[in-house]
Amino acid sequence: MKIIMLGAPGAGKGTQAKMIAEKYGIPHVSTGDIFRANIKNGTELGMEAKKYMDQGQLVPDELTVKILLDRVAQDDCKNGYVLDGFPRTIPQAEVLDKALTELGDAIDFAIDVNVPDENIVKRMSGRRACLSCGATYHVEHIPPKKEGICDKCGQELVLRDDDKPETVLNRLKVYHDQTQPLIDFYTKKNVLKTVDGTKDMKEVFADIVAILG
């Protein structure tokens, strides 16, 4: 079972990907993790990717797909995998699709965790972090005992720049411009399934399990 997770930043797709991986005993393949592992291990592909990253450039799609295919060709992926963080654009999806087709393979499910923008802004701008010990909170869902103060170390909690409403809205714009077209791409391939990501995390997971069987 080969699955791609789609959804806006903050939709909770990473959490769902981990839960799917655990339930079905298949690896959670995150492109960020693969890049870090390849660079850490000094692989040829990793060193090539590092050249781009060190210059602050995006790693070309062909190279990303090469690194990805190298990962999914490993033994632990023979029964499937959950892809998280790739593809993000139509060109990436096309390169991946072509590479999988050449291997006689294909994606079984593309799961879109759908959450309206206003929910995402509320979700992300409610996050608070302790810069001292790394603990994270949410003003609504996981509030600290004392407002604005970390339960663990007593330091002040902050709203990270990444979670500020204007930053979140910018990230959502990029998502809609680049990643939203993937919904149409995978719909045409008859593999797209949409779940309501506004529900409780466990309910969303139950909906995904009902799709995957």
Where are these regions (language model features)?
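Glycine-rich phosphate-binding loop of ATP-dependent small-molecule kinases
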Residues: 1-213
